From Swiss-Prot:
Family, per entry: Belongs to the Casparian strip membrane proteins (CASP) family.
Name under which the protein is recorded: CASP-like protein 0U1
A cellular component term, taken from the record's GO annotations: plasma membrane
Alphabetical keyword list: Cell membrane, Glycoprotein, Membrane, Transmembrane, Transmembrane helix
Location in or out of the cell: Cell membrane
Membrane topology, from the record: Multi-pass membrane protein
Length: 162
């Protein structure tokens, strides 16, 4: 019953959206993990996998009727927002770099991500994921600043007796 109540809160819905965005961002970059020319994409993949796991664990914690203190929750999500934003920047810079390739004896200079949509899509999802994580951090700060207000990260009714 507690899991159903937890799933109805805006905080939990935001966590689900973050989980999906992290999943999409690392899933589309998965096949670049062993490509030596694109090793900088591994950072985006690793950070998104880490975010995906942490968000999934936190959803389980919320479904069990627990929640982190709002300030700790805000700090964790702010840290991940910064890491995801750095991963976005690394991916965007790598995609805009030029590389020289040799095809049939001809040397061609082109952008790293030219003709490839996966890194661009992953960068876009990482950017949006960073915004969502920053929003989660703001929600944690709001809950910390107003302790008398209903907790945004919890699903328990503050007026009911325990």
């Amino acid at each position: 019953m507690a899991a159903v109540e937890a799933a109805k809160t805006p905080r939990f819905i935001l966590l689900i959206i973050e989980w999906v965005f992290a999943l999409v961002a690392f899933a589309v970059m998965g096949h670049y993990l062993f490509d030596d020319r694109r090793s900088s994409f591994e950072y985006l993949t690793a950070i998104c996998i880490l975010v995906w796991l942490v968000v999934m664990i936190y959803m389980v914690i919320l479904c069990c009727g627990r929640a982190l203190p709002p300030l700790i929750e805000a700090a964790i999500f702010l840290l991940f927002a910064i890491l995801v934003f750095i991963a976005f920047l690394v991916t965007a810079v790598k995609c805009n770099n030029s590389e020289t390739i040799v095809i049939a004896g001809q040397t061609i200079s082109r952008k790293v991500c030219e003709g490839e949509s996966e890194p661009k899509a992953a960068a876009a999802f990482a950017f949006l994921l960073g915004l969502l994580l920053a929003g989660s951090s703001v929600l944690g700060c709001i809950a910390f600043r107003r302790p008398s207000a209903p907790p945004l990260s919890s699903f328990q009714n503050p007026t009911s007796s325990v």
